[in-house]
Amino acid sequence: MAAGSAADGREGAAVHARAFLYRHAGWLLPLAFAVLVTLLGQWWSPEAFDPDEGINLGKGALVAAGYHPYAEIWNDQPPVLTYILAGVQTVVPWSVGAARVAILAFACLLLFSVFVLVERSAGRAEAVAAIILLGTAPLMWRLSISVMIGLPAVALAVAACAIVYGRDRAAPWRAVAAGLVFALSLQTKLFTAAALPAFLMMAYLADEAGPRGRRAATAATALAATVAGFVAIAWASGEPFLAQLIGPHVAGAVRSDYSFIVTAGHFAEHLVQQPFVVIAALLALTPAGRPAGRLRLAWLAWLGVAAVSLLGHTPLRYHHMLLLLVPLVCLGGEASWRVLRAAWPARWRLARYRTALAVIVPVVAVAYLVLMIRPFHDDETPGVNEAAERLAAHAVADPWVATDQPFDAFVAGLLVPPELVVFSIKRIETGNLTPEMLLATIAARKPGQVMLRRTHADRTVRDYLERTYVPLDPRRLHYLRPDLAN
């Protein structure tokens, strides 16, 4: 009797534990994601995961030092993440890890918001499937601790959708709040404009029992709040919208290289790197997996507009695909659960294959785990950033360095001249950064150090540096101002 009671107690505790995990999956799964990324991802890598990390960190450091994000800094992106990184820099100076923690917080917000939306529109089990798909996507792992603007922008866009799409009657304050959050998304990275039609559809669908007029008013309120928030941020930050935020991305020098075939090839290449997301999304095309959730049309709108936008963009880079990943996991999460539920009654048929499954399932699981963490382990990660250490050796004497790798400068605790902190290939290709501009900035600012190790240095620039600076490392084109060499 006692043994039976103990067994019943253990079984009851297990049932309660499973119920607790299922009931609170919305925040437990993002928390588990953060823990796994912290344990498996190379958080404290002294090298940048992407060149854009250095640009964003450098801009944040300059704004924290009192520089205007547009009047003094050449900047072709919206300002929200720059302001956030400036705040991080103020609280925890020169910490790459702290900045990556901020991005991981946005990743958790994205996972939670996806869960909320899918749960409200399709069900809790479908939401768990969607969040697992997104949380195990290799792209999500890579971007979750890369100091880049795409993930925060997408996270804010999905959060805005989660705010506006409630179970109960839509309230005006919710539409206003959602619109303001979507404005923050746009002012983080403009590519989330592709999600705007889906956002407005969700605002319209939020009050399904209400009359059409009231639903249209909710969508109009959300749109008005988005426009008002966007304009307010643009005005407060003084952003040159057409000249710098739009112009460099549609310049003739960039568009002349556009090829649909090449872009479509990159599109397919980046997409197949998220295999389980693609497979789950394809299940939505099957009769058993066809989504029936209330937001399926909104997700299809997001997917379609995003796909067209990305196929028309040049250059298309891997991190742009996150915009496509959100609707794919939401549709795929529902579809995969519906297929599993439809196949469950026939599960006994798998018994004859249990030996093969006992081998195949663990192999697939391990292979997928390796695929997830591969972005962090493609190459042997160095223990130190040698270039940053060389810069840091002379950092006390002068806090400035002109460099084409601002990540090195940030790790060394140095500022990059505001005219040069956005040292990107696109800026060079569009003529917004020429050798003459580089030379003029170095001559005017007279930074304590110059290091050009990422891009080709013009002969004129080299000659000037040889005449006016002391060479320290020819391989990295590292130069020191003469008065600091004594």
What do the PLM-derived regions correspond to, one by one?
Residues 5-8, 12, 171, 195-226, ...:
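Perimembrane helix-loop-helix junctions
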Residues 77, 191-192, 364-486:
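Extracytoplasmic
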Residues 101-122:
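Transmembrane-helix motifs of polytopic, lipid-linked glycan transferases
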Residues 112, 270-307, 332:
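Hydrophobic, aromatic-rich transmembrane alpha-helices
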Residues 113, 133, 152-169, 177-182, ...:
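Specific aromatic-rich, kink-prone transmembrane helix
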Residues 119-125, 158-177, 209, 277-295, ...:
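Membrane-interface transmembrane helices that cradle and orient dolichyl/undecaprenyl
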Residues 130-131, 174-190, 196-201, 224-225, ...:
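Membrane-interface alpha helices of multi-pass inner-membrane proteins
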Residues 142-152, 317-318:
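Short acidic/glycine- and proline-prone juxtamembrane loop motifs at membrane-interface regions
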